[in-house]
Regions:
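Short, flexible, mixed-charge glycine/proline-rich loop motifs
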Residues: 198-212
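Soluble catalytic domains of membrane acyltransferases
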Residues: 5-170, 174
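Short, structured interface segments
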Residues: 173-194
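Glycine-rich, charged/polar anion/phosphate-binding loops
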Residues: 141-143, 197-200
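Unusually extended, aromatic-enriched hydrophobic runs near protein termini
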Residues: 131, 180, 207-210
């Protein structure tokens, strides 16, 4: 919407092309997750391919009315959610994409969390193409421990990880390998390689929130 476009103009520089919006649904998107940019950026990139996001029930509790209107799919963490699988199949059957963040939580240090093989099993079960989207720089924009947003470039890499022709032949292990490979990131290395300067008064403000005595 208008707010999203304004945010990605003034708060962060999102670098992307039309690759994702040109892929014909239904398909499943898996992406790394460091913050709001990964969600808002995904909406911007999908354009008219209106997708449904899989989120945890704990997030539903924060803004239940708003989130339900957005058409999200709620997931109970650390369990096999049969109802969720039915809902995902329903959305795909309507010719819409489904977006999953397989790390299940925000990155704490600007590198990936563990991606479990269960997501690869789900992709195999759904029998639709798999698209990976990697965000580089969204952790730098706002680390998990910081309340301050920093203006910086966020680059996106979109890949069709598994095609419609491959999905029936490829193994779960190979699907998992491709997901992990395509979503591997290191935001501080990205900052170093691209000579990104982040100039704010208190660069470490909020870091004490994750320190323990």
């Amino acid at each position: 919407g208008l707010y999203g476009k304004r945010y990605f103009t003034k708060k962060v520089k999102l670098i992307y092309d039309d690759t994702l919006s040109k892929i014909k649904p239904p398909f499943v998107v898996v992406a790394n997750h460091c913050g709001f940019v990964d969600v808002g950026g995904m909406v911007m990139m999908l354009k008219n391919n209106c997708g449904s996001f899989v989120i945890s029930v704990t997030q539903m509790a924060q803004w239940p009315g708003l989130i339900k209107q957005m058409g999200v799919l709620a997931k109970k963490q650390f369990t096999v959610d049969v109802n969720l699988i039915k809902e995902i199949k329903y959305v795909l059957g309507k010719g819409r994409p489904v977006i999953i963040y397989p790390e299940a939580k925000l990155s704490v240090v600007g590198k990936p969390n563990v991606i479990k093989p269960a997501v690869a099993k789900l992709i195999k079960l759904l029998k639709v193409p798999l698209v990976t989207v990697r965000f580089d720089g969204s952790y730098l924009h706002q680390p998990r421990w910081s309340k301050i947003k920093r203006f910086c470039p966020v680059n996106t890499t979109v890949k069709v990880a598994v095609t419609e022709e491959e999905i029936g032949k490829i193994s779960v292990d190979e699907i998992h390998r491709r997901i992990v490979e395509n979503l591997t990131f290191d935001d501080y290395q990205y900052q170093f390689d691209n000579k990104i300067s982040i100039d704010i008064p208190d660069l470490a403000g909020g870091l004490e929130n994750i320190l323990y005595k």
